[in-house]
Amino acid sequence: MHEIITLQLGQQSNYLATHFWNTQESYFTYAENEESAIDHDVHWRPGLGADGSETFMPRTVIYDLKGGFGSLKRINALYDIHDDDPAQSSSLWNGQAVVQKAEPIEPSAYQQSLDAGLEPPQLTTESVRYWSDFNRVFYHPRSIVQLNEYDLNSSIAPFERWDSGEELFANLDKEHDIVDRDLRPFAEEADHMQGIQIMTTVDDAWGGFASRYIERLRDEYGKTTIWVWGLQEGFQGVSRDKRLLRLVNKAKSLTEIYKQASLLVPIAIPSSLSPRLRKVLSLDTNSSWHTSALLSAAIESATLPSRLKDATNRDSLGNMTDLLNLHGKQTVANLQMSFSETTEVPRSEEVGDEPKDGLRLDLDLRPADDMGDGRKQQNGYHRTPKIFSQVLASRGERTGDDEEEGDSDEEDDRTRRRGPREAISRKYRTTLSYPLPDSFPHIFRDEKGEELKSNVAMTTSLSTDAALSGRLKSLRSTVTRLIGVEDRETLSNELAEMADEYHEGWSSGSDSGEDD
């Protein structure tokens, strides 16, 4: 087995991860002669419930603030043992106990139907209050970690500054040794751990928490592949001061995570869409349920090779990292996606004059890196960047040609690079389409504008390109004047050094690749 352990840090990341786990749950097959294309052992752990029954639960640790779990209980039905005689419970206190309880959050109608084994009602943006409202899986009690030091959405003490997250991690780690308490039990269960996948926001306090967590992980698991999905919120309707704070948080997160992670992929919903995308994508950008669904579909598809059974198109997170990181320091990648009906091939276009220069997909998920970027950006694109390396994952294309192409198809899927200055590329393929469980919002449309309700063909791209150099310089010019004198020079230098790794001339020092 090549297990992957997931860490989920914060409310927005848990929305994202809930879609991810619901998708993994949908891959299970129950017919006697039906075999799944997915190796479930990569993300799921076997165990025993309180009654001795076998269980299969995610290899994940979920962190959220007080009030962030909604109606989700730490002890679920598989581990709940009812004690009818409280006198039998062990206690060192013989006096009268006074128990204070907060008003419990009522489970959503969707959750109540799942618990009762009934057909659940269709979810809506109004009925989804928390990520747990559309959750379809059981978690091990060890997976649930509530941080009581901060309340969710508090206006008195908001969890929004990078330094607050850094401080919280330091205090908790000093008291509990977080890695040893929370992650090590899952790591010790793994026969051959493939890597650690982390989902976190990077433009708030969770960025500071994540940065120090990853630093500890690197100390404990020096050679383990660590992938970080760095979520960033949009700027629409956000005050100038909050925008600047988020950019400072992001700059600190990028420089700190860059030092330790094997791969960091910043992601966000584009601020505007092309007319075609507005036709085929029905997205409520004010709904975390909607936006996290789109991002999760891209992430789940991009990492699909890491859990496929098909040896030809299966690959590890470590190998994909090596393909993207050509020179040892290009560890920040960009995520793109295209989707369509399963009877069609998802749209893409060549970046340069030949396919060797890379492919550009419909939707670019790189975040805004300066105050004006979100206003001028459409589908995430400026000018066409020089691509250094690209890893493509294509799923659900039912053209009928795959089995007949034989050797030519196999040759096309191999890692290709024709010359020292050309993009290196690798493409993974599977007929397994992206599933749409009933917990997933109806955001995908066909070219006629009609809902896609069962599954979707999808292509994703992870790439390293020269555009990041200009973006990092733009971020640097915005945030350095906002940082205290004691940290300003260090942060400025670190952003500049990161930008230098993505010049179009690679190690030549050429500035020709700057796009901003």
Give residue ranges: language-model regions:
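Terminal, contiguous helix-loop blocks that mediate binding/assembly
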Residues: M1-T201, A205-D516
